[in-house]
Design a protein with these regions (language model features):
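Mature extracytoplasmic or organellar-lumen-exposed domains after removal of signal/transit peptides
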Residues: 32-370
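Bacterial N-terminal signal peptides that target proteins for export
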Residues: 2-16
Length: 370
């Protein structure tokens, strides 16, 4: 598998160097969990969360193709609500899987191929407008979008086509509708490829589950467990920094509602909820982080994390406006600041206390430097 060869030298040599230099773990924390516990942990997270999440994404993406194919055959008389419902189901599946920031997702252009966001320079929107304005049919043939900019074939592009000017997809023989279908087909193929890389021949799953023996990807089982821990912490950082703090701005006058994720389809809060539920599942699944913490006498850490996640989810459920309106609402500012404080506490709890209790070391993530 190409990505295994690409990662082999860097990951194994870096891990070995850090371990030998004593910079990864102190002697007291290095043995916090046993080889068997770490192996059971990574197996549980892989088989109960990661593989099912990508399988769901592949299934929903395939269903999206079917719904759009049927609708685009006669968009002027079709039921657009079915398209929107399936778009949301597909995006739900992606938001559940979004926490996973390693492995096959980084094969061929990375997570941006599924969702190019945030688009900080507006590059994607400019490309999309050009395609739609020119009715550029080079995006329509099978496989064409896989060779073009990720911003033209991802779920953000699909949201733009469906929601920026909905009337475009309702016209007979609509270019916009055909383009939406091409995007859906692009996502269907990509999601199926990811599942195949996780569970097919010479699979990434095998590389994870056999980490204790040393594989092309992981030096040992604790490096693999640390990778999962890092994704928990990274997901919390993305929520805090990119999905809430960035659109809020430093002051109410600096708020930028259109920086909220998926503001056109009104699902910014839903995305955050699903991301947090994935973090929660990493703790709550059988043989997951929560069970391991209990096994080593650190159940108070697990309980504190789960309690804080429940509080944050309750906080989100109390909002009665979309995030795009909340960030520009002076009356909501205090509630959003309180939410950010809770997320900072959760991030510290996971990255510091939970990691210390387990003897694991989370590394860098996508938000470092933001």
């Amino acid at each position: 598998m190409p990505f295994l060869k690409a990662f082999k030298r860097t990951l194994k040599c870096t891990s070995a160097t850090l371990l030998l230099s004593g910079t990864l773990l102190s002697p007291a924390s290095a043995d916090a969990i046993s080889t068997d516990q770490a192996t059971a942990l990574i197996a549980a997270l892989t088989d109960q969360l990661v593989v099912p999440a990508y399988t769901e994404l592949a299934e929903e993406s395939s269903q999206l193709v079917e719904v759009l194919d049927s609708y685009c055959a006669a968009p002027n008389t079709g039921d657009r609500s079915k398209v929107e419902t399936q778009f949301h189901s597909t995006m739900d599946a992606w938001q559940r899987a979004q926490i996973i920031q390693f492995g096959p997702i980084y094969e061929n252009k990375g997570p941006a191929r599924i969702q190019f966001w945030p688009d900080k320079r507006g590059t994607g929107q400019r490309q999309l407008r050009q395609v739609l304005n020119n009715q550029d049919e080079t995006v329509l043939p099978s496989g064409a979008l896989a060779e073009k900019s990720v911003a033209l074939g991802d779920l953000q592009a699909l949201e733009y086509v469906l929601y920026n000017d909905p009337e475009l997809t309702t016209q007979p023989d609509s270019f916009a509708c055909h383009y939406a279908l091409a995007i859906a087909r692009n996502q269907e193929v990509h999601a199926a490829d990811i599942v195949q890389m996780w569970v097919g021949a010479d699979s990434y799953r095998d590389q994870v589950l056999n980490a204790a023996d040393g594989t092309d990807v992981f030096f040992d089982e604790k490096e693999a467990a640390s990778r999962f821990l890092n994704d928990m912490a990274g997901a919390i950082d993305v929520i805090r920094l990119q999905k809430i703090d960035r659109p809020m701005g430093l002051t109410i006058t600096g708020a930028r509602p259109k920086r909220t994720e998926n503001w056109r389809s009104g699902r910014s809060l839903r995305n955050i909820q699903l991301n947090l539920e994935s973090v929660q599942h990493f703790l709550a699944v059988e043989d997951g982080f929560g069970d391991v913490l209990s096994d080593i006498g650190k159940e108070t850490t697990s309980q504190a994390a789960q309690q804080l996640i429940s509080e944050i989810l309750g906080h989100l459920a109390a909002f009665d406006q979309p995030m795009s309106k909340l960030v520009a609402n002076p009356d909501a500012r205090g509630d959003l600041e309180s939410l950010l404080t809770k997320l900072r506490s959760l991030q510290s709890l996971v990255r510091e206390q939970l990691a210390q209790d387990l003897g694991l070391v989370p590394g860098f993530n996508a938000t470092d430097g933001d």
